[in-house]
Amino acid sequence: MEIQRITHLPPQILDLEKAAVAGGFRFLTRLTSEWQSGTHCFDAPGECLMAAYLNQQLVGIGGLSVDPFTHDRTGRLRRVYVAPASRGQQVGRRLVNALLAHAALHFERVRLYTDTLEGSAFYLRCGFNRIEDAHASHIVRITKR
């Protein structure tokens, strides 16, 4: 498996989006819409979009942005999704670890919001802690390397 920082949406994003929508998730639709309109391209300082490839197939995607709900050195994980057929193979964990490694260069903490039990359990396994906040469900403090 290979994790790459990407600066354009690969054509395979449409297949990943279709799988996400079938699973009840619309955030990849929002990712493609915001990317195409230029509203959010993960190109501000400290931001990035990463893709996970397995046998040259896009199997996961995730972004890191500046957290718009804070005014300090806080990043936000956004649009993290792994294709159902690739779950349980450490794709999500490796993708999140790559995003957090990038975050360590720019942020002191990273927050995210998930409203699913599966997502919450996944992020807890990745080292995040639950928080009570109107705009975030989990946080992790970054240790500088």
Where are these regions (language model features)?
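Conserved acetyl-CoA pyrophosphate-binding loop and the N-cap/start of the following alpha-helix
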Residues: 85-86, 90-98
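Conserved beta-strand in the GNAT
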Residues: 51, 57-66, 76, 81
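Conserved GNAT acetyl-CoA-binding A-motif
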Residues: 103-115
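Short amphipathic alpha-helix that is part of the acyltransferase structural core
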Residues: 1-37
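Conserved catalytic-core motifs of GNAT/GCN5-like acyltransferases
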Residues: 111-113, 124, 129-144
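A short acidic/small-residue loop/turn micro-motif
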Residues: 66-68, 138
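A short helix-loop-beta-strand connector motif used in the catalytic cores of GNAT acetyltransferases and
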Residues: 39-51, 76
